[in-house]
């Protein structure tokens, strides 16, 4: 069979044969097979051209996706799947890109963790979850995480949390809030506890007293409509204790308030 036309169509080329067959191919395919108008090709050669054209198109799509930022093998695979590239072609493309180091899950994990230590606020547990969602194996994740020390980051995040909540919460509630926030961000309990112990917390008794009475006003408005006497006092004590206030401070405030 003979090639009757090779015409550029945006990023692809339209190849027509004298038996009316048409197919879209990449520029790489033209170069690889040295295709030109009037060239005779066999059925076997046509099959090879079609296979390579699909591979080349898939690879070009993947490289386009990778041109914006580093990505994992799973992310590239998902992108190619969305563009209807056949599974066997995707496998070939991924193998080729891994060989040329365009895709490197270990390098991705290392950069991801390093970037978080420099500008992020997440601990190892959250990072492990995020990297796992991106298709990186648990072995690679664990090995890369073991190369980093999260102490400095834990301390930095704890200090930010202290600044955010110190004047808004009583001492006990402040401790609970900082510890829980650190754990939610992926730090271990021991890391969170150590970071909290390193904080320089200045007790502002006047502010603590102000917070207590403000909360007492709020709880009194809530419970005084239904309770009085001993029941009201008990309700207020329980409510304030749940908010993290010390029982002796609560008792003292209630003596003045009621």
From Swiss-Prot:
TM ranges? none
Which compartment or compartments is the protein found in? Cytoplasm
Could you tell me what this protein is called? Regulatory protein RecX
* Gene3D superfamilies, per database record: Winged helix-like DNA-binding domain superfamily/Winged helix DNA-binding domain
Q: Which Pfam families match?
A: RecX_HTH1, RecX_HTH2, RecX_HTH3
Entry annotated with the keyword Hydrolase: no
What this protein is reported to do is described as:
Modulates RecA activity.
Record-linked InterPro entries: RecX_HTH_1st (IPR053926), RecX_HTH_2nd (IPR053924), RecX_HTH_3rd (IPR053925), Regulatory_RecX (IPR003783), WH-like_DNA-bd_sf (IPR036388)
* Keywords carried by this UniProt record: Cytoplasm
Question: Biological process (GO) annotations?
Answer: regulation of DNA repair
Gene Ontology annotations for the cellular component aspect, listed alphabetically: cytoplasm
The organism named in the record is Streptococcus sanguinis (strain SK36)
- Which family is this sequence assigned to? Belongs to the RecX family.
């Amino acid at each position: 069979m003979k090639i009757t036309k090779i015409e550029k169509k945006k990023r692809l080329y339209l190849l027509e044969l004298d038996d009316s067959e048409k197919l879209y191919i990449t520029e790489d395919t033209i170069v690889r097979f040295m295709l030109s108008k009037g060239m005779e090709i066999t059925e076997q050669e046509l099959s090879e051209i079609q296979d390579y054209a699909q591979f080349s198109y898939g690879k070009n799509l993947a490289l386009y996706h990778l041109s914006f930022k580093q990505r994992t093998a799973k992310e590239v695979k998902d992108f190619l799947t969305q563009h209807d590239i056949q599974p066997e072609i995707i496998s070939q493309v991924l193998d080729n890109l891994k060989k040329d180091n365009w895709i490197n899950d270990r390098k991705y994990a290392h950069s991801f963790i390093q970037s978080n230590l420099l500008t992020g606020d997440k601990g190892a547990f959250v990072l492990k979850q995020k990297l796992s969602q991106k298709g990186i194996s648990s072995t690679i994740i664990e090995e890369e995480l073991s190369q980093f020390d999260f102490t400095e980051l834990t301390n930095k995040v704890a200090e930010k949390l202290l600044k955010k909540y110190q004047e808004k919460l009583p001492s006990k509630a402040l401790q609970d809030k900082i510890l829980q926030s650190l754990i939610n961000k992926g730090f271990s309990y021991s890391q969170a506890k150590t970071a909290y112990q390193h904080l320089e917390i200045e007790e502002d008794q006047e502010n603590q007293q102000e917070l207590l009475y403000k909360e007492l006003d709020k709880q009194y408005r809530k419970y005084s409509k239904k309770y009085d006497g001993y029941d009201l006092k008990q309700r207020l004590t329980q409510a304030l204790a749940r908010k993290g206030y010390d029982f002796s401070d609560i008792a003292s405030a209630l003596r003045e308030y009621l």
